[in-house]
Each structure stands twice: as structure tokens, then as C-alpha cells.
Amino acid sequence: MKNISLLGASGSIGTQTLDVLRSHPDQFRLVAFSVGKNIDYAVKVIQEFSPQIVSVQREEDVLKLQAVSGNTKIVYGSEGLLEVALHPDAEIVVNAVVGSVGLLPTLRAIEAKKTIGIANKETLVTAGHLVMEAARKHNVSLLPVDSEHSAIFQCLNGENEKRISRLIITASGGSFRDKTRDELHHVTVEDALRHPNWSMGSKITIDSATMMNKGLEVIEAHWLFGIPYEQIDVVLHKESIIHSMVEFEDRSVMAQLGSPDMRVPIQYALTYPDRLPLSDTKQLNLWEIGTLHFEKMNQERFRCLRFAYEAGKAGGSMPAVMNAANEVAVEAFLQKRIGFLTVEDLIEKAMNHHNVIARPSLEEILEIDAATRRFVMEQI
């Protein structure tokens, strides 16, 4: 029986993580979780899983939950998030929150020697050097939950990572993959939220449409697997059947395939190095699919992917700036305050405005994050 703490239980990854726990009640126990403002959902999860600690975003929601939570301790805010991450009984902390708010809980959980199931891209994007140093220092495993990084991780089982020639990350292309840049001037929030292959939260669905999601994954892969950016490629693959590939020195290529279902990489992170049945996921039938398509990625068409490569190669504080600018811009787009292509423009302005700090401390990263958010908000 593995004890699990789940950060971000009401989001897309969080709800699918609970599906996995539900499927294997003899294998996993939920000891703590966090939610934002979805209190009705939190009540249902408490009633089903009986966790010891639950954290909510706002203090005013604590009393609402306490009235129905029984023996479950209710906490709130950033301190509450840390309490969930540091639950003394938790062996695995699944970080499924959206945005840079996931950074500090991850670092503290690593220091407490928890195994980390990392679904929060922004943690490695904003502070990859700090996270990987901490993981090495405390001998902690970071197990990828993203389908692409899980695919690479699985392809590397039993392999010598020094023999890697290239990582090939696949991209569905998002909801606007067939549109020209001229057509993107007029797209709506509703258009952007219709992803062709995956069921995800609103922020990551917009990131998929801009291709920033893939850019974040490139930076994340750089840190997780220690591969230079020059050896990380992205290929457009509309079917989302091949989740990523690894090319080795002898030009052999290993790929991980499967029907698009986030529960597969989530469960693998929780059961690693073992595997368990996942009977209600769709079996892959290649003869039904017939053909798999691949296209070269155009970084002028998808400028956010180019920004991510530029930020990653610049290093230091630049990825944190790019990430903060993107979070503010995407939120403004979701609120219909800016157009779709303005997201790219705001990120570019923020990156051009910033002077890179080579090895920023945690405090400097948090300051840069806040300053970048203020700068971008002033541009809107």
C-alpha cells in the first residue's frame, strides 16, 4: 500500500489520478490533497477517500469544509499546500497544480525525501537547476507524469543515457494546427478550448493551441534527462499515438505508443517500476488507425515553441520570465481581454525586457516571477 499526497485534486490530472487510485484501492491510499476553490468537489473526495489533511485556496472555505469533513484536518493557502506536500505518511507526492505555485511544495517535498510524481511543468521550467540539484542531494526520484516525458522515461528503461543521440517529442498541434497565422487573428476562446485528442484543463489546452505546452515540455525534458536543447526535437504527430521517441547513437529509435489516455502515464508513475492492469483504457489497434502522420514543426508558425527554445538556451532566469508572462497572457485571453496572437506578443515583450540572471536563487526566481507578472499586466 502506497500513501499518496495529491496537489491539485480538482484539475484534469488530479481527477484522473483519483481515477487510478479508485481502480486500485488495495494499492494506494490518499492521505492528503489540495484543491483551489472547488469546494463541492472537495467534499465528495473527502467522503470517498477519507484523507487526513485537505488544503483549500481561501480561508473562507475552511469553515465550509470543516462542517462536513469529520476527522479530516482542513488547512488553506500556501502554507496549507506545503502541509499537504509534507504529510509525514506520504511516500509519493503527485504535483498536479497548474502554474508556478507548484514550485515551493515540490522543493520542500524533495527535501523531505518524498518521491515526486511531476505533472506540474512550471516547476522544472522556472527552477530546473534548483529542483534537480535538490533531487540529487536528497536521492529523490522525479517520476514524470506528462505523457511525453513518461514515454521517454519508459524508452530509457535499461538503457545507457550516455548513448542518447536525440529526444523526439511528439505534438498533436493543438486545436489550431490546421489554421494559418492569418486565420488565428480571429479565433475565439471557445475555439481554442476544443482540443482534438486530449481532455485537459483550460490553461494547458490554450498552451497546446499556442504550442507553449510543447515548449515547456522541451525545457522539462532538458532537465529531467540532462539532454542539451540541440538534441531535443519536436515533431507534429496529429494522432497522438506515439507519445515520444528516443534515438540512440546507433540510430536505433525507441518509441512508446498507446491510445491517448493520461491515466496510463499517471499510473506508471505511481506503480514504477511495476505495472498494473488498466482494463478500461482503450486498447491500441494499429489496423484501425491505418496511418500515422508526421510533419516538421514550423517555429515561425508556432512562435511560442521558438520562445521556449530561446529561453531554455539563454538559461538562468529567462525560462521563469517566459513562464510568468505566458501564465498572465493566457489568463487574459481566457477572460477575453486580449486576442489569441497577443499571447505571443506579450511573452516576447517580457523576454526582451529581461536581463538574465545566470543562476538565480529561489528568492530571486520568485521576485522575477512577480515582477514579470506586473510588467505583463501593465501591457494589457
Curated annotation (Swiss-Prot):
Its cofactor is Mg(2+); Mn(2+). NADPH binds at S10, G11, S12, I13, G36, K37, N38, N120, E122, G201. Pfam families: DXP_redisom_C, DXP_reductoisom, DXPR_C. GO terms for molecular function: 1-deoxy-D-xylulose-5-phosphate reductoisomerase activity; manganese ion binding; NADPH binding. Keywords: Isoprene biosynthesis, Manganese, Metal-binding, NADP, Oxidoreductase. Mn(2+) binds at D146, E148, E217. Its EC number is 1.1.1.267. This is 1-deoxy-D-xylulose 5-phosphate reductoisomerase 2. It comes from Bacillus anthracis. The gene is dxr2.
